[in-house]
Amino acid sequence: MKLNRCNPAHLRVTEVALAVFFTLSVPVAVARIVDSRGQSSGGVCEDIYRRYNEDHILCRQPESACQPVASGVEGADKDIILAAHNRYRSQIATGNNSSFPHASNMLEMEWDDDLARVAQAHANLCSNQPSCSSCMRIEKFPHVGRTGCLIRTDSENNTADWEGCIGYMYKESLRIPTTSSNTPLRTMRGVESFTQLAWATTWKVGCGYVKYPSGSALRFEKLYTCAYGPGGNVRGEEVYKVGPACTDCPEGTCCGESCQQYNITPSYSGLCKVVDDGPIFPLDDEDNLLFRCLFNKATSQSCNFQSDPSDGWKTKTFFASTGHAESVLEAGQSAEMTFEQPIKSSHGRLCIEVEYNKGPNVAGTLDRGLFELLVTPVVRPQRQRTINLSGGAINTMRMRITLHYNFDVKIGFSFIVPRGSPAQYVNIHKVLIYEKACPERYRHALD
């Protein structure tokens, strides 16, 4: 590539002893790492996982003391896992056997092999310690959620009890104080497994299982792990929208009678079933939205951009609703991109919202990439303005910036890696431009 140069709670279970639940809440302890050519608990440690976190689940090795007697998720178990998740989600959405408000936008979950690989890699570590979000991140889901449980037992039975494990997750809801029928539910400490199970916009799940000898009084431990995409338990966000079931299903889904046009018979009452290449989620305040680019199929036309050099940026689309623009540069290189569509506000105020990750291409090395927002007047390009966008080496960042222009401008981005620096990357997930001032200018980590 030619580039420019520049200067939980404890409870008794019927199987025998103890069930422990965990979610993504506390950084995991340091484990042994293998290089990109080595074998890990999940197979080959690919370079992209070494980018996300130097302690990524797919780059760890299990302790030598871990000697599984059973592991993996069979086809029949996948059906049980999906049925249990969707049955509980349906109960919440419709208000059947649930003390919570009805959910208007609850998606039906589907199996995902990539998430299952991550979940199995975690289970293979034979450790119930919680792990960080970036430790389980995969390319198509920047934020991956996780739940699971650990059961200690004397039983020789190697069969996984997924119904029991997922049922215990649901029972965490008993700890949530009773609220009115119109009060939105938010994540809270001690019930994160339940709120991830009930997170409306999560629609992919994959799980892993392992049974191994225990160092405790009981002879064996059974470790269950599930990974979710997109992950839930996002601070400040509602678990689901309150309202009659099916009334807020996103584009690309059907629910109830609306599924007849797709010749689909719904399996679960009140759940929005994906009928295409993933749901397309609505954006906030669409009435004031001048420009949207999520680098996905739904916004592909508005995402057209010019890259300098031509191979400095590339786009990747994973589902109808998700994708990103990416630049990976070595020391002394730079690249710019500029959206082709000019933007103008009728009253001179623009709010630009950018969601991104940036950092070293190998986690643990220096974060030296300079990522900037470019605002270029169409008639006076020499008056270009640059705004630094920092952070994001581990977390997905969201920046909102208010601009004041009463003439056409073009929006773009610049990425520069100084000489002597390790390789750096940036992923831009979302660019939204509103015809209004932002509520505030801030930088916010999403996970």
Q: What function would you assign to each model-found segment?
A:
Residues 15, 27-329, 333-338, 362-372, ...:
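Mature extracellular or exoplasmic CAP/SCP-family domains and secreted bioactive peptides
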Residues 377-409:
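Extracellular carbohydrate recognition and processing domains
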Residues 413-422:
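Short beta-strand-plus-loop segments that form exposed binding edges in beta-rich domains
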